[in-house]
From Swiss-Prot:
Name of this protein: 4-hydroxyphenylpyruvate dioxygenase
Pfam families in alphabetical order: Glyoxalase (PF00903)
Family as reported in the entry's similarity comment: Belongs to the 4HPPD family.
Pathway(s) it belongs to: Amino-acid degradation; L-phenylalanine degradation; acetoacetate and fumarate from L-phenylalanine: step 3/6
Residues annotated as domain VOC: 18-149, 181-339
GO CC field: endoplasmic reticulum membrane; Golgi membrane
Keyword Hydrolase: no
Ligand binding (Fe cation): H184, H267, E350
């Protein structure tokens, strides 16, 4: 595991502030938004569709504290772009939007360094105010929207959006999701494509390396991965980039790439200030989490006896809820991962709480991999690499 201190070049003007929102392209935006509200504690915050004058695409925006997800679906049969995207990828994250200062400058800098432009800067406005956007291509079919508020914005979400048409009376009766903000967003790459993507972020967005692990550190009996985390100068946006490494069997990173059809967003980590309450509440709402074996907690108890930090939470409760712990000499983190959010074994979510710890759970990767491999095996996807490069199921 490596942590980096060199922040590299700072933008002469403008800066990346934070994650703003995520856009999912899905087959049925209304149902997808309702699922995340019911299961994770989001609430509808804005809508754009036929009733608001949007004739081609419907958008349902949902919010929990500082987290905003937007679910979009095509309204007409002829939408080839969205239709082909869903045939190839299934439901998934299409766009990761960053709030920025000086969109024009950051966009031009990225363009000058070779970034593929999806859409040049443009402005949208309504009675709430003005917002400037630009869109760049990143890994796979995923994009980044640069979003700049041109003065205070007083609308419900962004120009063109209106109040939700319906507020489900079920939602106020359910326990809080206790989720606060996007901690990090992980992108999975095919083999040998991690470093070029990391270099794209460094060159085009002036992000820098923050943390990394290689396959010598992250492996199970069967599979392994490499990961490099990139971040903006202010270190408010964290983007781990993963790739599979050669192993005896297909890794869960390769399984993702096979089923998604390309590189894409593997998981979204949501930060909480009370993971025990969050996990209890999310389980009661019907969220399925991966399960760590009891041997993990037996080993953890042994290791913590000689650790320089003290875990405040009751280890028996963490074990009961299957929450994982990672630590160093200065602090620790608590994390847990959901099962995939759709039938394809692609996107899943993470819930994470940090105590002066800025890593990404390297100490838990082996346990996480083994838990995923159990499910992978049940799907018939824990396959052996054959000499001809094909996969064989035992």
């Amino acid at each position: 595991m490596t942590s980096y201190t060199d922040k590299g070049e700072k933008h002469a003007r403008g800066r990346f502030l934070s994650f703003h929102h995520l856009t999912f392209w899905v087959g049925n935006a209304k149902q997808a938004a309702s699922f995340y509200c019911d299961k994770f504690g989001f609430e509808p915050c804005a809508y754009k569709g036929l009733e608001t004058g949007s004739r081609d695409v419907v958008s349902h925006a949902i919010k929990q504290d500082k987290i905003i997800f937007v679910f979009q679906s095509p309204l007409n049969p002829g939408n080839q772009e969205m239709g082909q995207h869903m045939i190839k990828h299934g439901d998934g994250v299409k766009d990761v939007a960053f709030q920025v200062e000086d969109c024009d400058f950051l966009f031009q800098k990225a363009k000058d360094h070779g970034a593929v432009v999806v859409r040049e800067p443009w402005i949208e406005e309504d009675e709430g105010g003005k917002v400037k956007y630009a869109v760049l291509q990143t890994y796979g079919d995923t994009t980044h929207t640069l979003l700049e508020y041109l003065g205070p914005y007083r609308g419900v979400f962004l120009p063109g959006y209106k109040e939700p048409l319906f507020r489900d009376p079920l939602l106020p009766t359910l326990p809080s999701g206790c989720l606060s903000f996007i901690d990090h967003i992980v992108g999975n790459q095919p083999d040998n494509e991690m470093v070029p993507i990391v270099e794209w972020y460094q060159k085009c967005l002036l992000f820098h390396r923050f943390w990394s692990v290689d396959d010598k550190q992250i492996h199970t009996e069967y599979s392994s991965l490499r990961s490099i985390v990139v971040t903006n100068y202010e270190e408010t946006i964290k983007m781990p980039i993963n790739e599979p490494a050669a192993g005896k069997k297909k890794s869960q990173i390769q399984e993702y790439v096979d089923y998604y059809g390309s590189a894409g967003v593997q998981h979204i980590a949501l930060n909480t200030s009370n993971i025990i309450k969050a996990v209890k509440n999310l389980k009661s709402r019907g969220i399925e989490f991966l399960s760590a074996p009891d041997t993990y907690y037996e080993e953890l108890r042994k290791k913590l006896k000689t650790a320089k930090i003290t875990v405040k939470e009751d280890l028996n409760v963490l074990q009961e809820l299957k929450i994982l712990v990672d630590y160093d000499d200065k602090g620790y983190l608590l994390q847990i991962f959901t099962k995939p959010m759709q039938d394809r074994p692609t996107l899943f979510l993470e819930v994470i709480q940090r105590y002066n710890h800025f890593g990404f759970g390297a100490g838990n990767f082996k346990s996480l991999f083994e838990a995923i491999e159990t499910d992978q095996d049940a799907r018939g996807n824990l396959t052996i690499y054959a000499a001809n490069g094909e996969h064989q199921v035992l």
